[in-house]
Amino acid sequence: IPALKITRHNGTDFPGSLAVKLCPDFLKYIGKPEHIIAVTGTNGKTTVANMLNDVLTAEGKTVLSNRAGSNIISGVSTALLKGCGLLGRIRPEYDLAILEIDERSAPRIYPYVKPEHIVITNLFRDSIMRNAHPGYIADILTRSLPKESRLILNADDLISCTVAPENQRVYFGIDRLPTDVTECENLLNDMRICPRCAGKLRYEYRRYHHIGR
């Protein structure tokens, strides 16, 4: 990684990409901090991961992260490499890791990386060719997230807050805003039916799409 900086390559992907090509289960063997927080979701994961990083750094913690933006397996591998010595053990100065993780990369990362906490910001339609429907992504996360991880979920998003129902969880939400509406005007709405009782959802207010209360 230092050599890449000297040659003016930022190295956000290449070291980890090479490591995974040489050893597909590289993440199994590389050292990791004792405490790991993962952030995933369709929108806002970079912002949330960076905010957590900044807050914890301001509190005096030494944080290992992939905040340069590469959130697939190669980027996560590079971030962990950055925190390890020559023998692959995590250097003792790192108190924890904040890792932004792409939703579709979950099956390749979570078998080897076991976060204490996983923040899921929301799940939306994104790239149809890659992500299909948000329910499809929710199913990937449900099957991939470590059972021991505590989830921090968006209570205003009925898709992401139902992920991995067997995991321990806490919820966050945002109070009603002046711009919220009582009727949804979006042509697309991926959550019309209650995921528990199958009845039609009645919203007190909506923020956009299926986000609301």
Question: For the regions a protein language model found, what residue spans apply to each?
Answer:
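The −1 position to Zn-ligating cysteines in a subset of zinc-ribbon hairpins
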Residues: 193-196, 200, 213
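Short Cys/His-rich "knuckle" micro-motifs
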Residues: 202-208
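Phosphate-binding loop of NTP-binding sites
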Residues: 1-196
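Generic preference for hydrophobic/aromatic residues in regular secondary structure cores
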Residues: 63, 201-202
